[in-house]
Amino acid sequence: MKVIDTDLLSIQQARILLEQAENSRKILLDIDKETRNELLKKIKQYYKTNIDQLAKMSFEETSYGKYEDEIKLGNYYLDNLDDELNSYPQIFDIVNGKNSKQVALSKGVSLVFIAPYLSTLTSFQAIYFAIRALNPLIVVSDLRCEKTVTKMVEDIKKILKENFYPRGFLDILTYNSDLGEKTLYESEKVSFILENLLSENKRKIQNDKAQIFKAEIGNNIVFIDKDCDIDKASCEVINSKTFNNGLLPGVEQSIVVEENAYEKVVEKFKEYGAFFLSKDEHIKLEKILYDQDHNCRKELIGRSARQIAEIAGIKVNSDTKILVVTKPYVSEKSPYSKEKYNPIVSLYIENDWLNACEKCVELILNDKKGQSLSIYSNDAYVIEQFIEKKPVARVLVNSPTGLGSVGIGTNLPISFSLSTKKIEGCNQTSLTPNHFMKFREIGICDKKDISSFLSEKTVKKDKDLFDKILNSLEKNY
């Protein structure tokens, strides 16, 4: 009988991938902008042609979410991709600041972990951004979606090979093991790590040399004020929460309602497909849905509200889209106060907006994953207080947190990897092309207030040289 040591194979493969990625980088920097853009068009066309097949394949592997929603979101992204990226520089572009200039540079070897939800979208976006910035990329897929992600990577590798890109520019760890992954994420060769995983699957990454973007779904909250358009709020929140069966970055987890608006909210929620669970029902559901550590059972992630209710033995209406658990207080021990990977929300009732404000903070601090908060209100002062005082990465106004946070119907970037924290050198918590680049400030001695140190002739000469360098960068790359 042949015995295979997967750990050793995984470590060996990880080392080879790192070596090849580092070697490819030296060749990549000679590739001009026109050649890069032609390649990006081909990769975009590949995804556009194959998105239906890939999304269905991913669903067959994972049973998570709704492949129709991933296709819809993917096509929306592709239709808006060129306009979306126009405002972001490419490498060697000169970025003009108020008092100085910066040049965009490739960040280096990058590593991305892919979660088993929206896996084709997150893979495409990471690969596209990495190629755009000429960053060699190593992909590590969750085992549940490994076949789909591997197919995508191998298909795009063929396109790279046909266009004479170096070996190692893009690859995937096919011998998965904890030790192999550790070899990758602890390597000094890695400059950027995108950790896009479900919270309970997060790695304990330690790497002082790499910037780490920790993406997650988040424990996101919606506050519904008594003076807002309750019909609009109810419709948008329910449709956002049910999108992809609740597997969307920034998706709604808890609703905080002002007492005077409660009855109207319940009426409208029911109208749009909400089913309110009794205390006995939500206790029964909790026992079925969560394990003893309060983690959602993997086989029940991304199921529809009706499927979950049926498994739990709870009779719901035929038009049920979302399950609502009414809670009197926030509990560290209750899974309903945290991230939920299904169309389930918790509902909290407060006397007024001030108490609602405190409840939102309590929910945010409960598991420290308060990524997005939405406020539905027409009161400018109340909106201002929520924006100013909530410890979250982003606040949305009169927009659902789920679809709004990923850039649908808002001015936020269209992005499928969201974080609670910024990384050095980038002021956005939605993954953008800038996360795959570093920016180096360029200064030149051309100010007249130092003429006592330098002659005017020298200053002009230096300035001419500086302009020549900038023009050369823009022309050649």
Regions found by a protein language model. Give the residues of each.
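ALDH superfamily catalytic-core signature
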Residues: 7-9, 203-331
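N-terminal Rossmann-like NAD(P)+-binding subdomain of aldehyde/semialdehyde dehydrogenases
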Residues: 1-103, 129, 271, 475-476
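Short, surface-exposed amphipathic charged segments that create phosphate/polyanion-binding patches used
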Residues: 185-188, 229-230, 290-298, 336-338, ...
